[in-house]
Amino acid sequence: MKIYLVGGAVRDALLGLPVKDRDWVVVGSTPQEMLDAGYQQVGRDFPVFLHPQTHEEYALARTERKSGSGYTGFTCYAAPDVTLEDDLKRRDLTINALAQDDNGEIIDPYNGLGDLQNRLLRHVSPAFGEDPLRVLRVARFAARYAHLGFRIADETLTLMREMTHAGELEHLTPERVWKETESALTTRNPQVFFQVLRDCGALRVLFPEIDALFGVPAPARWHPEIDTGIHTLMTLSMAAMLSPQVDVRFATLCHDLGKGLTPPELWPRHHGHGPAGVKLVEQLCQRLRVPNEIRDLARLVAEFHDLIHTFPMLNPKTIVKLFDSIDAWRKPQRVEQLALTSEADVRGRTGFESADYPQGRWLREAWEVAQSVPTKAVVEAGFKGVEIREELTRRRIAAVASWKEQRCPKPD
Protein backbone atom coordinates (compact mmCIF):
# COMPACT_ATOMS: atom_id res chain seq x y z
CA MET A 1 0.00 0.00 0.00
CA LYS A 2 1.28 3.46 -0.97
CA ILE A 3 -0.39 6.75 -0.06
CA TYR A 4 -0.06 10.02 -2.00
CA LEU A 5 -1.29 13.56 -1.45
CA VAL A 6 -3.08 14.58 -4.66
CA GLY A 7 -4.91 17.32 -6.50
CA GLY A 8 -5.69 20.77 -5.15
CA ALA A 9 -3.53 20.52 -2.03
CA VAL A 10 -0.42 19.85 -4.14
CA ARG A 11 -1.37 22.50 -6.69
CA ASP A 12 -2.06 25.27 -4.19
CA ALA A 13 1.04 24.52 -2.12
CA LEU A 14 3.17 24.86 -5.28
CA LEU A 15 1.44 28.17 -6.05
CA GLY A 16 2.13 29.43 -2.53
CA LEU A 17 -1.58 29.57 -1.72
CA PRO A 18 -3.26 28.40 1.50
CA VAL A 19 -4.17 24.71 1.43
CA LYS A 20 -7.72 24.20 2.72
CA ASP A 21 -8.52 20.53 2.09
CA ARG A 22 -6.16 17.62 1.63
CA ASP A 23 -7.14 14.58 -0.44
CA TRP A 24 -5.20 11.34 -0.60
CA VAL A 25 -4.99 8.44 -3.04
CA VAL A 26 -4.19 4.93 -1.85
CA VAL A 27 -2.49 2.63 -4.36
CA GLY A 28 -2.34 -1.16 -3.98
CA SER A 29 -5.01 -1.63 -1.34
CA THR A 30 -8.54 -2.99 -1.01
CA PRO A 31 -11.66 -1.77 0.79
CA GLN A 32 -11.30 -4.51 3.40
CA GLU A 33 -7.70 -3.53 4.17
CA MET A 34 -8.83 0.08 4.66
CA LEU A 35 -11.62 -0.98 7.01
CA ASP A 36 -9.25 -3.24 8.93
CA ALA A 37 -6.92 -0.26 9.39
CA GLY A 38 -9.73 1.71 11.05
CA TYR A 39 -10.83 3.87 8.11
CA GLN A 40 -14.54 4.64 7.71
CA GLN A 41 -16.06 4.13 4.24
CA VAL A 42 -18.18 7.06 2.99
CA GLY A 43 -18.20 6.64 -0.79
CA ARG A 44 -21.27 4.90 -2.13
CA ASP A 45 -20.30 4.77 -5.82
CA PHE A 46 -16.55 4.41 -5.35
CA PRO A 47 -14.32 3.54 -2.39
CA VAL A 48 -13.60 6.69 -0.39
CA PHE A 49 -12.64 6.48 3.28
CA LEU A 50 -12.18 8.88 6.19
CA HIS A 51 -8.97 8.70 8.21
CA PRO A 52 -9.73 7.63 11.80
CA GLN A 53 -7.88 10.61 13.32
CA THR A 54 -7.74 13.46 10.76
CA HIS A 55 -11.03 12.60 9.00
CA GLU A 56 -9.39 13.55 5.70
CA GLU A 57 -10.53 11.68 2.58
CA TYR A 58 -8.53 8.71 1.33
CA ALA A 59 -9.67 7.21 -1.98
CA LEU A 60 -8.53 3.97 -3.54
CA ALA A 61 -6.84 4.55 -6.89
CA ARG A 62 -9.46 4.15 -9.59
CA THR A 63 -10.25 4.57 -13.26
CA GLU A 64 -13.51 5.76 -14.79
CA ARG A 65 -15.21 4.73 -18.01
CA LYS A 66 -18.02 6.61 -19.75
CA SER A 67 -21.19 4.51 -19.55
CA GLY A 68 -23.99 7.03 -19.97
CA SER A 69 -24.80 10.67 -20.60
CA GLY A 70 -23.91 13.69 -18.50
CA TYR A 71 -21.55 14.05 -15.57
CA THR A 72 -22.95 11.04 -13.65
CA GLY A 73 -22.71 8.52 -16.48
CA PHE A 74 -19.47 6.83 -15.42
CA THR A 75 -18.50 3.35 -14.30
CA CYS A 76 -15.77 3.25 -11.67
CA TYR A 77 -13.09 0.56 -11.38
CA ALA A 78 -10.96 0.39 -8.23
CA ALA A 79 -8.51 -2.43 -7.58
CA PRO A 80 -4.96 -2.94 -6.27
CA ASP A 81 -3.61 -3.05 -9.84
CA VAL A 82 -4.74 0.52 -10.66
CA THR A 83 -1.60 2.67 -10.73
CA LEU A 84 -1.15 6.24 -9.54
CA GLU A 85 -0.72 7.35 -13.17
CA ASP A 86 -4.02 5.65 -14.07
CA ASP A 87 -5.78 7.51 -11.27
CA LEU A 88 -4.27 10.89 -12.17
CA LYS A 89 -5.18 10.46 -15.85
CA ARG A 90 -8.91 10.64 -15.10
CA ARG A 91 -8.56 14.14 -13.60
CA ASP A 92 -9.66 17.26 -15.43
CA LEU A 93 -6.60 19.52 -15.65
CA THR A 94 -2.88 18.79 -15.64
CA ILE A 95 -2.37 21.13 -12.68
CA ASN A 96 -4.81 18.93 -10.73
CA ALA A 97 -3.08 15.70 -11.83
CA LEU A 98 -0.12 16.14 -9.49
CA ALA A 99 0.76 13.91 -6.55
CA GLN A 100 3.25 14.06 -3.69
CA ASP A 101 4.72 11.06 -1.87
CA ASP A 102 5.62 10.85 1.80
CA ASN A 103 9.15 12.09 1.02
CA GLY A 104 7.80 15.29 -0.49
CA GLU A 105 8.67 14.27 -4.05
CA ILE A 106 6.25 15.48 -6.75
CA ILE A 107 4.92 12.89 -9.21
CA ASP A 108 3.95 14.63 -12.44
CA PRO A 109 3.11 12.26 -15.31
CA TYR A 110 1.16 14.85 -17.38
CA ASN A 111 3.37 17.98 -17.21
CA GLY A 112 1.28 19.74 -14.58
CA LEU A 113 4.40 21.46 -13.22
CA GLY A 114 5.15 22.93 -16.63
CA ASP A 115 1.60 24.17 -16.99
CA LEU A 116 1.72 25.66 -13.49
CA GLN A 117 4.87 27.52 -14.44
CA ASN A 118 3.35 28.69 -17.73
CA ARG A 119 0.04 29.55 -16.04
CA LEU A 120 -1.97 27.25 -18.32
CA LEU A 121 -5.23 25.44 -17.64
CA ARG A 122 -4.92 22.38 -19.90
CA HIS A 123 -6.95 19.16 -19.94
CA VAL A 124 -5.19 15.90 -19.13
CA SER A 125 -6.72 13.71 -21.84
CA PRO A 126 -9.57 13.57 -24.37
CA ALA A 127 -11.67 11.96 -21.60
CA PHE A 128 -12.18 15.55 -20.39
CA GLY A 129 -14.88 15.81 -23.06
CA GLU A 130 -16.97 13.08 -21.41
CA ASP A 131 -17.91 15.20 -18.38
CA PRO A 132 -19.86 18.42 -19.11
CA LEU A 133 -19.39 19.67 -15.55
CA ARG A 134 -15.75 20.22 -16.41
CA VAL A 135 -16.68 23.15 -18.65
CA LEU A 136 -17.95 24.96 -15.56
CA ARG A 137 -15.03 23.80 -13.44
CA VAL A 138 -12.46 25.15 -15.88
CA ALA A 139 -14.33 28.46 -16.06
CA ARG A 140 -14.28 28.58 -12.26
CA PHE A 141 -10.56 27.79 -12.11
CA ALA A 142 -9.95 30.54 -14.68
CA ALA A 143 -11.76 32.98 -12.37
CA ARG A 144 -10.03 31.69 -9.26
CA TYR A 145 -6.52 32.00 -10.68
CA ALA A 146 -6.98 34.98 -13.01
CA HIS A 147 -5.03 37.23 -10.62
CA LEU A 148 -2.04 34.90 -11.05
CA GLY A 149 -2.15 35.22 -14.84
CA PHE A 150 -3.65 31.83 -15.69
CA ARG A 151 -5.35 31.31 -19.04
CA ILE A 152 -7.06 28.37 -20.71
CA ALA A 153 -5.00 26.44 -23.26
CA ASP A 154 -6.30 26.90 -26.80
CA GLU A 155 -6.90 23.18 -27.31
CA THR A 156 -8.85 22.98 -24.04
CA LEU A 157 -11.07 25.91 -24.99
CA THR A 158 -11.65 24.27 -28.37
CA LEU A 159 -12.73 21.06 -26.64
CA MET A 160 -15.05 23.04 -24.35
CA ARG A 161 -16.68 24.59 -27.44
CA GLU A 162 -17.13 21.17 -29.01
CA MET A 163 -18.76 19.85 -25.83
CA THR A 164 -21.12 22.82 -25.72
CA HIS A 165 -22.09 22.50 -29.38
CA ALA A 166 -22.68 18.75 -28.93
CA GLY A 167 -25.35 19.53 -26.33
CA GLU A 168 -23.44 17.96 -23.42
CA LEU A 169 -24.27 20.86 -21.06
CA GLU A 170 -27.96 20.09 -21.31
CA HIS A 171 -27.33 17.06 -19.06
CA LEU A 172 -26.25 19.27 -16.14
CA THR A 173 -28.72 19.59 -13.27
CA PRO A 174 -29.70 23.08 -12.07
CA GLU A 175 -28.21 22.33 -8.66
CA ARG A 176 -24.75 21.60 -10.11
CA VAL A 177 -24.83 24.65 -12.36
CA TRP A 178 -25.73 26.87 -9.41
CA LYS A 179 -23.15 25.24 -7.13
CA GLU A 180 -20.34 25.97 -9.60
CA THR A 181 -21.70 29.46 -10.23
CA GLU A 182 -21.95 30.24 -6.53
CA SER A 183 -18.39 29.05 -6.03
CA ALA A 184 -17.20 31.18 -8.96
CA LEU A 185 -18.96 34.21 -7.48
CA THR A 186 -16.74 33.93 -4.39
CA THR A 187 -13.52 34.30 -6.39
CA ARG A 188 -11.50 37.48 -6.81
CA ASN A 189 -12.51 37.80 -10.48
CA PRO A 190 -15.98 36.27 -10.91
CA GLN A 191 -16.49 38.08 -14.22
CA VAL A 192 -13.87 35.76 -15.77
CA PHE A 193 -16.16 32.77 -15.13
CA PHE A 194 -18.91 34.28 -17.27
CA GLN A 195 -16.47 35.51 -19.95
CA VAL A 196 -15.09 31.97 -20.32
CA LEU A 197 -18.61 30.57 -20.60
CA ARG A 198 -19.29 33.10 -23.33
CA ASP A 199 -16.03 32.24 -25.11
CA CYS A 200 -17.01 28.57 -25.37
CA GLY A 201 -20.71 29.18 -26.13
CA ALA A 202 -21.93 27.92 -22.76
CA LEU A 203 -23.31 31.27 -21.60
CA ARG A 204 -26.03 31.08 -24.26
CA VAL A 205 -27.00 27.62 -23.00
CA LEU A 206 -26.87 28.16 -19.24
CA PHE A 207 -27.42 31.92 -18.85
CA PRO A 208 -29.31 33.08 -21.96
CA GLU A 209 -30.58 36.18 -20.11
CA ILE A 210 -27.00 37.37 -19.62
CA ASP A 211 -25.79 36.28 -23.05
CA ALA A 212 -28.59 38.35 -24.63
CA LEU A 213 -27.01 41.55 -23.25
CA PHE A 214 -23.93 41.30 -25.47
CA GLY A 215 -24.33 43.45 -28.55
CA VAL A 216 -27.06 45.57 -26.93
CA PRO A 217 -25.88 49.21 -26.98
CA ALA A 218 -26.38 51.82 -24.27
CA PRO A 219 -25.95 55.61 -24.71
CA ALA A 220 -22.24 56.38 -25.10
CA ARG A 221 -22.64 59.48 -22.94
CA TRP A 222 -23.39 57.32 -19.91
CA HIS A 223 -21.72 54.11 -21.06
CA PRO A 224 -18.44 54.69 -22.92
CA GLU A 225 -18.07 50.90 -23.12
CA ILE A 226 -21.44 50.94 -25.01
CA ASP A 227 -22.02 47.16 -24.97
CA THR A 228 -24.37 46.16 -22.12
CA GLY A 229 -22.80 42.71 -21.82
CA ILE A 230 -19.37 44.25 -21.31
CA HIS A 231 -20.85 46.68 -18.78
CA THR A 232 -22.43 43.76 -16.91
CA LEU A 233 -19.08 42.01 -16.51
CA MET A 234 -17.43 45.30 -15.51
CA THR A 235 -20.03 45.89 -12.80
CA LEU A 236 -19.56 42.34 -11.52
CA SER A 237 -15.81 42.93 -11.35
CA MET A 238 -16.43 46.14 -9.40
CA ALA A 239 -18.92 44.43 -7.07
CA ALA A 240 -16.24 41.84 -6.26
CA MET A 241 -13.95 44.68 -5.16
CA LEU A 242 -16.67 46.28 -3.04
CA SER A 243 -18.17 43.23 -1.33
CA PRO A 244 -17.37 39.56 -0.64
CA GLN A 245 -21.10 38.68 -0.50
CA VAL A 246 -22.44 36.30 -3.15
CA ASP A 247 -25.84 38.04 -2.77
CA VAL A 248 -24.38 41.41 -3.81
CA ARG A 249 -22.32 39.97 -6.64
CA PHE A 250 -25.17 37.94 -8.13
CA ALA A 251 -27.60 40.87 -7.85
CA THR A 252 -25.08 43.08 -9.66
CA LEU A 253 -24.75 40.47 -12.41
CA CYS A 254 -28.53 40.59 -12.94
CA HIS A 255 -29.13 44.33 -12.54
CA ASP A 256 -29.51 45.15 -16.25
CA LEU A 257 -31.23 42.01 -17.56
CA GLY A 258 -34.19 44.12 -18.64
CA LYS A 259 -32.08 45.83 -21.32
CA GLY A 260 -32.10 42.54 -23.21
CA LEU A 261 -35.85 43.04 -23.76
CA THR A 262 -35.59 46.48 -25.37
CA PRO A 263 -36.68 46.38 -29.05
CA PRO A 264 -33.70 47.26 -31.30
CA GLU A 265 -35.59 50.20 -32.81
CA LEU A 266 -35.52 51.87 -29.38
CA TRP A 267 -31.77 51.40 -28.82
CA PRO A 268 -29.65 52.79 -27.24
CA ARG A 269 -32.26 53.95 -24.70
CA HIS A 270 -33.78 51.49 -22.25
CA HIS A 271 -36.61 53.23 -20.44
CA GLY A 272 -38.15 51.06 -17.74
CA HIS A 273 -35.52 48.35 -18.05
CA GLY A 274 -35.30 47.96 -14.26
CA PRO A 275 -38.84 46.77 -13.53
CA ALA A 276 -38.86 44.91 -16.87
CA GLY A 277 -35.85 42.90 -15.76
CA VAL A 278 -37.53 41.56 -12.62
CA LYS A 279 -39.32 38.80 -14.54
CA LEU A 280 -36.06 37.74 -16.17
CA VAL A 281 -34.37 37.59 -12.77
CA GLU A 282 -37.20 35.38 -11.50
CA GLN A 283 -36.96 33.19 -14.61
CA LEU A 284 -33.21 32.70 -14.25
CA CYS A 285 -33.42 32.03 -10.50
CA GLN A 286 -36.28 29.56 -10.86
CA ARG A 287 -34.44 27.64 -13.57
CA LEU A 288 -31.21 27.36 -11.55
CA ARG A 289 -33.00 27.01 -8.20
CA VAL A 290 -31.16 29.96 -6.74
CA PRO A 291 -31.75 30.35 -2.97
CA ASN A 292 -34.65 32.67 -2.14
CA GLU A 293 -32.61 35.27 -0.25
CA ILE A 294 -30.22 35.69 -3.18
CA ARG A 295 -33.11 35.79 -5.66
CA ASP A 296 -35.03 38.39 -3.66
CA LEU A 297 -32.10 40.80 -3.50
CA ALA A 298 -31.47 40.40 -7.24
CA ARG A 299 -35.11 41.28 -7.95
CA LEU A 300 -34.92 44.40 -5.79
CA VAL A 301 -31.65 45.55 -7.34
CA ALA A 302 -33.03 45.10 -10.86
CA GLU A 303 -36.09 47.16 -9.95
CA PHE A 304 -34.54 49.96 -7.90
CA HIS A 305 -30.88 50.49 -8.91
CA ASP A 306 -31.69 53.38 -11.25
CA LEU A 307 -33.79 55.03 -8.55
CA ILE A 308 -30.75 55.22 -6.26
CA HIS A 309 -28.78 57.02 -8.98
CA THR A 310 -31.36 59.84 -8.88
CA PHE A 311 -31.35 60.11 -5.07
CA PRO A 312 -31.08 63.95 -4.85
CA MET A 313 -34.28 64.21 -6.91
CA LEU A 314 -36.30 61.84 -4.72
CA ASN A 315 -38.79 63.40 -2.33
CA PRO A 316 -38.80 62.21 1.30
CA LYS A 317 -42.02 60.24 0.81
CA THR A 318 -40.46 58.27 -2.06
CA ILE A 319 -37.35 57.55 0.02
CA VAL A 320 -39.39 56.14 2.91
CA LYS A 321 -41.52 54.17 0.45
CA LEU A 322 -38.29 52.70 -0.98
CA PHE A 323 -37.37 51.44 2.48
CA ASP A 324 -40.84 49.89 2.71
CA SER A 325 -40.48 48.27 -0.72
CA ILE A 326 -37.18 46.57 0.09
CA ASP A 327 -38.47 45.48 3.54
CA ALA A 328 -35.61 47.35 5.19
CA TRP A 329 -37.34 47.49 8.58
CA ARG A 330 -37.06 43.70 8.88
CA LYS A 331 -33.97 43.26 6.68
CA PRO A 332 -31.81 46.36 7.24
CA GLN A 333 -28.82 44.76 5.46
CA ARG A 334 -30.60 45.37 2.18
CA VAL A 335 -29.92 49.11 2.39
CA GLU A 336 -26.17 48.49 2.38
CA GLN A 337 -26.52 45.84 -0.33
CA LEU A 338 -28.51 48.19 -2.55
CA ALA A 339 -25.96 50.96 -2.01
CA LEU A 340 -23.11 48.64 -3.01
CA THR A 341 -24.78 47.24 -6.12
CA SER A 342 -25.73 50.73 -7.31
CA GLU A 343 -22.16 51.93 -6.75
CA ALA A 344 -20.84 48.95 -8.72
CA ASP A 345 -23.22 49.89 -11.55
CA VAL A 346 -21.87 53.44 -11.73
CA ARG A 347 -18.21 52.51 -11.38
CA GLY A 348 -18.46 49.51 -13.73
CA ARG A 349 -18.04 51.75 -16.75
CA THR A 350 -15.03 52.67 -18.86
CA GLY A 351 -13.39 55.72 -17.29
CA PHE A 352 -15.58 55.70 -14.17
CA GLU A 353 -13.77 52.99 -12.21
CA SER A 354 -12.62 55.44 -9.51
CA ALA A 355 -15.74 57.62 -9.52
CA ASP A 356 -17.22 58.85 -6.26
CA TYR A 357 -20.76 57.67 -5.52
CA PRO A 358 -22.35 60.06 -3.01
CA GLN A 359 -25.80 58.56 -3.64
CA GLY A 360 -24.70 55.52 -1.66
CA ARG A 361 -23.74 57.69 1.32
CA TRP A 362 -27.01 59.61 1.14
CA LEU A 363 -29.01 56.38 1.01
CA ARG A 364 -27.24 55.10 4.12
CA GLU A 365 -27.70 58.41 5.96
CA ALA A 366 -31.39 58.63 5.07
CA TRP A 367 -31.85 55.10 6.38
CA GLU A 368 -30.18 55.94 9.69
CA VAL A 369 -32.50 58.94 10.05
CA ALA A 370 -35.65 56.99 9.13
CA GLN A 371 -34.96 54.05 11.41
CA SER A 372 -34.09 56.32 14.35
CA VAL A 373 -37.73 57.44 14.62
CA PRO A 374 -38.95 55.59 17.75
CA THR A 375 -42.03 53.39 17.46
CA LYS A 376 -42.46 53.57 21.23
CA ALA A 377 -43.12 57.33 21.11
CA VAL A 378 -45.92 56.81 18.57
CA VAL A 379 -47.60 54.21 20.79
CA GLU A 380 -47.21 56.38 23.89
CA ALA A 381 -48.84 59.27 22.00
CA GLY A 382 -52.05 57.23 21.94
CA PHE A 383 -52.10 55.94 18.37
CA LYS A 384 -53.65 52.49 17.94
CA GLY A 385 -53.90 49.77 15.28
CA VAL A 386 -53.31 50.93 11.73
CA GLU A 387 -52.85 54.48 12.99
CA ILE A 388 -49.50 53.48 14.49
CA ARG A 389 -48.02 52.60 11.10
CA GLU A 390 -49.51 55.68 9.43
CA GLU A 391 -48.13 58.02 12.10
CA LEU A 392 -44.78 56.25 12.12
CA THR A 393 -44.55 56.69 8.34
CA ARG A 394 -45.50 60.38 8.66
CA ARG A 395 -42.78 60.97 11.27
CA ARG A 396 -40.20 59.10 9.22
CA ILE A 397 -41.01 61.22 6.16
CA ALA A 398 -40.71 64.39 8.26
CA ALA A 399 -37.36 63.27 9.68
CA VAL A 400 -35.99 62.41 6.23
CA ALA A 401 -37.26 65.75 4.89
CA SER A 402 -35.42 67.63 7.63
CA TRP A 403 -32.23 65.65 6.99
CA LYS A 404 -32.48 66.10 3.22
CA GLU A 405 -32.83 69.85 3.58
CA GLN A 406 -29.56 70.01 5.47
CA ARG A 407 -27.43 67.21 4.02
CA CYS A 408 -28.53 66.30 0.50
CA PRO A 409 -27.86 68.78 -2.33
CA LYS A 410 -30.83 70.03 -4.28
CA PRO A 411 -30.94 68.86 -7.92
CA ASP A 412 -30.11 71.38 -10.62
Swiss-Prot record:
Disulphide bonds in the chain: none
Binding site for CTP: G8, R11, R91, R137, R140
Binding-site residues for Mg(2+), renumbered to this chain: D21, D23
Cofactor note: Magnesium is required for nucleotidyltransferase activity.
Domain HD: 228-329
Record's keyword terms, sorted: ATP-binding, Hydrolase, Magnesium, Metal-binding, Multifunctional enzyme, Nickel, Nucleotide-binding, Nucleotidyltransferase, RNA repair, RNA-binding, Transferase, tRNA processing
Cofactors demanded by this protein: Mg(2+); Ni(2+)
Catalyzed reactions per annotation: a tRNA precursor + 2 CTP + ATP = a tRNA with a 3' CCA end + 3 diphosphate; a tRNA with a 3' CCA end + 2 CTP + ATP = a tRNA with a 3' CCACCA end + 3 diphosphate
NCBIfam families: PRK10885.1
Function: Catalyzes the addition and repair of the essential 3'-terminal CCA sequence in tRNAs without using a nucleic acid template. Adds these three nucleotides in the order of C, C, and A to the tRNA nucleotide-73, using CTP and ATP as substrates and producing inorganic pyrophosphate. tRNA 3'-terminal CCA addition is required both for tRNA processing and repair. Also involved in tRNA surveillance by mediating tandem CCA addition to generate a CCACCA at the 3' terminus of unstable tRNAs. While stable tRNAs receive only 3'-terminal CCA, unstable tRNAs are marked with CCACCA and rapidly degraded.
Assembly and interaction partners: Monomer. Can also form homodimers and oligomers.
Similarity annotation: Belongs to the tRNA nucleotidyltransferase/poly(A) polymerase family. Bacterial CCA-adding enzyme type 1 subfamily.
The protein's name: Multifunctional CCA protein
Species annotation: Shigella boydii serotype 18 (strain CDC 3083-94 / BS512)
Taxonomy of the source species: Bacteria, Pseudomonadati, Pseudomonadota, Gammaproteobacteria, Enterobacterales
Gene transcribed to yield this protein: cca
